[in-house]
Amino acid sequence: MAIAESFQLSDGYSVYAGVRARRDGVVEDAAFALAKIGGTDGTSAASKILEALLRRDVSLVMLDGCIVSFYNWVDGEALYAKFKKPVACYVFEEPEGRVEEAVRKLFTDWEVRIEAIKKLGPPTVYYTKSGYKIYIRAWGIDPVDAGRAAEYCTGFGKIPEPLRVAKIIAGAARQFLKTLGKFRFLW
């Protein structure tokens, strides 16, 4: 199972898409949720998707990043505690920038945000057999095992197929919602 998001700052919201996929990457179902850009509702959006898609046979929840939507976040530990399924957060590019410094400048509730981001913990670097570097945070599963799981369902490149598909679907849904906004007079 995988959850990814898509946003543009001008939208004011981020579209989260989740897919339930088999180990071979074949997608069986999808669900959506919205979160506010710069909000604090990323975990809630991911939780709504899990409520819609989770089954007993799901063995891992994959997240495309934990710090998302302009410093919103998804709390993998909270999802693991609530749903009793291992959760792994993957980042495919080297983390850059000074997150704490930016959060202090941008948000009045910066203390709460920094505490939540620190609670995520530092990522573990995992090197794939094909030489890619993945940054992994994990709850209920060893980060190395989460890396192996990602490799297992990666057809090409470094992004596991369920996350790649979830990201594509999130982007398409965001574009569709923007199109609907242009035609509100029809309803």
Curated annotation (Swiss-Prot):
Q: What InterPro entries has UniProt attached to this entry?
A: Endo_dU (IPR002802)
User: Pfam families, alphabetically?
Assistant: DUF99
Q: Which residues form a coiled coil?
A: none
Question: Its family?
Answer: Belongs to the UPF0215 family.
Family annotation (HAMAP family): UPF0215
Identification of the protein by name? UPF0215 protein PAE0952
